Amino acid sequence: MSGKSPAQTRVVVGMSGGVDSSVTALLLKEQGYDVIGVFMKNWDDTDENGVCTATEDYKDVAAVADQIGVPYYSVNFEKEYWDRVFEYFLAEYRAGRTPNPDVMCNKEIKFKAFLDYAMELGADYVATGHYAQVRTDEDGTVHMLRGADNNKDQTYFLSQLTQEQLKKTMFPLGHLEKPEVRRIAEKAGLATAKKKDSTGICFIGEKNFKKFLGEYLPAQPGKMMTLDGVEMGNHAGLMYYTIGQRGGLGIGGQHGQLTSDPWFVVGKDLTTNTLYVGQGFHHEHLYSTSLDASDLSFTREMPETFDLHCTAKFRYRQEDTGVTIHVKADKVTVDFDEPVRAITPGQAVVFYDGEECLGGAMIDVAYKEQKVMQYQ
């Protein structure tokens, strides 16, 4: 933290119209900071009923900001979001991968475009309603730690943040659990106290995903096969399926198979537009022993090349897995202590040392005993 008093410290809060960012602004205001609220409009968003949800959310931001007595603004990042997040999102699906737009949205919008805008407003820091914590050493190095609420910890989605971004960031909810945040909002009578949490893609909301994706990418139906060549039917388009997916295959326990075990997606072949499926949650082709990832980013300074035993998550809310990482510039090979199920290219692999999030990378390919998985 700077040597300034709270009253001399300007904090620009990213306010979404939800309860978390509302309480973030409230707590900072109560702590005496010079708080400004900013609503980011990143998507031209109309829901299934024709209601522009961004307009409704902005009204909630205005109501809360008025209640707690802070100025507020709206800023339009639709172009930045389209260029830096949505184009990436579509390119990943075209390549048969399953992207994580929330990771990219934090990296490119909330902690880049928004951070730059906040600095123009004279900010010393930005703050968001993420469940994560920061700790600063005497030498100024910032460590990003998991949020106190294990169910809500969001360091997975913040794993691409750099040291420079973290030095300018505050996470006032990091030490709180979600029920306590709700209680604070209710006690203060905030307009958003009872508003339900948003789900769905970062800034795109709760649209019908298949229909939404189909508006931007033409679907290419193809064959659904087992790994030993038995045709099981047709798929609607490889982009609609992810490794380990069970629902939406429409094959049940059919085709004269010996068991009634459910079917899962075990691979995709873009060259032949084939979706591979296998029977059983523990199908051997769902398990990998290592992966390669790129776009590696650490939350603090690290050597150019090194090996480290630590833990990792391969998806949000997953238990940590012991791994050994082999780092070379912005690429990393990750060897697992135990085989891991349903490693998904396009998703983030995020590294931890105890409570500290060290950073992460985007998964390119998984292997089983050096044999490439998922992409035949």
From Swiss-Prot:
Catalytic activity reported: S-sulfanyl-L-cysteinyl-[protein] + uridine(34) in tRNA + AH2 + ATP = 2-thiouridine(34) in tRNA + L-cysteinyl-[protein] + A + AMP + diphosphate + H(+)
Pfam families: tRNA_Me_trans, tRNA_Me_trans_C, tRNA_Me_trans_M
GO CC, one annotated term: cytoplasm
Region (Interaction with target base in tRNA), start-end ranges: 100-102
Subcellular location per the Swiss-Prot or TrEMBL entry: Cytoplasm
Annotated S-S bridges: 105-202
InterPro entries on file: MnmA-like (IPR004506), MnmA-like_C (IPR046885), MnmA-like_central (IPR046884), MnmA-like_central_sf (IPR023382), Rossmann-like_a/b/a_fold (IPR014729)
Keyword Transcription regulation: no
Region annotated Interaction with tRNA, chain positions: 152-154, 315-316
Entry's Gene Ontology BP terms: tRNA wobble position uridine thiolation
One GO molecular-function entry: ATP binding
Protein EC: 2.8.1.13
Key words of the record: ATP-binding, Cytoplasm, Disulfide bond, Nucleotide-binding, RNA-binding, Transferase, tRNA processing, tRNA-binding
Primary location group: cytoplasm
Active-site residues, Swiss-Prot/TrEMBL: 105, 202
Residue(s) at site: Interaction with tRNA: 130, 347
Residues reported in the UniProt entry to bind ATP: 14-21, 40, 129
Gene3D superfamilies per record: Adenine nucleotide alpha hydrolases-like domains, HUPs, Translation factors
Function: Catalyzes the 2-thiolation of uridine at the wobble position (U34) of tRNA, leading to the formation of s(2)U34.
PANTHER family hit by this protein: MITOCHONDRIAL TRNA-SPECIFIC 2-THIOURIDYLASE 1, TRNA 5-METHYLAMINOMETHYL-2-THIOURIDYLATE -METHYLTRANSFERASE
Family designation: Belongs to the MnmA/TRMU family.
Protein name, UniProt field: tRNA-specific 2-thiouridylase MnmA
Organism expressing this protein natively: Lactococcus lactis subsp. cremoris (strain SK11)
Chain's gene name: mnmA
